[in-house]
Amino acid sequence: VETWPGRIIFSGFEIGKDILTGKEVAQMSVKNSPIKDAYQMSLSQDNPEGRNSWDQTAVLVAIKGYKPYFKIKLGTIQINDTTGTNQWIDDTAGKHAYLIKEMPEPEIAAIIENYMKHQPLKK
């Protein structure tokens, strides 16, 4: 992380744990959808209200940017190569950042769910 040329935005555990998605995807009528099928299987075995959205929130920020969904805290993460431990240092000029929730979880979940329900157009 020290030598990465651009900004790194960390999306922590707390970001995706309460943003539940997949319920609407699992109920779609589309056939042969690996995403729909995976959610149907996992929701029946886990939480029927949805799955935690750690990956989806990271992808949302990577594609659309962090605003208006989140705020960021600037700083620098230092990683000890020997122990694997890390330390965050607040720094308004830092090239690292971590996400802080800005919008309510259900609103972010609805936005992500809408993207996940998108079907490709036939050409």
PLM regions: where:
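N-terminal acidic, glycine/proline-rich low-complexity segments
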Residues: 1-123
